[in-house]
Regions:
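Short, solvent-exposed loop/linker segments at beta-strand-coil boundaries, enriched for Pro/Gly
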Residues: 56-61
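Beta-strand-rich interaction surfaces with strong enrichment in secreted/lumenal proteins
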Residues: 30, 62-66
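Short, hydrophobic/aromatic beta-strand segments
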Residues: 50-54
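N-terminal edge beta-strand
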Residues: 4-39
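Short proline/glycine-enriched turn/loop motifs at strand-loop junctions of beta-rich domains
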Residues: 43-49
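Extracellular/periplasmic metallocenter environments
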Residues: 65-107
């Protein structure tokens, strides 16, 4: 009898951030290790947009991430050019507000 392999949606080493409808998050500052291959996974019960639009840009390949209602989206690993110990501000745009948390990259 064949069995389906269950693949987890996130990895244990992912950094999880839950966004609310007002843009607030449960993890205001996220620490990401390039050498460990950490990723950020954003979750939201409602639609949300994650946007790295500050002059520092994004530490990830993409600058905008769309979180579907009731779903999640992952950043992928930090790009090689992401600066260590740098604070990357981003905006979380929820249906009823905006918040500006931070991702900090470590080697």
């Amino acid at each position: 009898m064949a069995t389906d392999k269950v693949i987890p949606m996130t990895r244990p080493e992912d950094r999880h951030v839950h966004a609310e409808h007002d843009g607030k998050v449960d993890n205001q500052t996220v620490h990401v290790s390039k050498s460990a291959g950490h990723q950020v996974t954003w979750f939201s019960a409602r639609k949300a947009v994650i946007a790295f639009s500050s002059p520092s840009g994004s530490p990830f390949e993409e600058t905008i991430f769309h979180v579907p209602a009731g779903g999640s989206v992952s950043s992928g690993p930090a790009k090689p050019t992401a600066e260590a110990e740098k604070h990357y501000k981003y905006s979380v745009v929820g249906e009823k507000g905006v918040n500006d948390p931070t991702v900090i990259i470590h080697n």
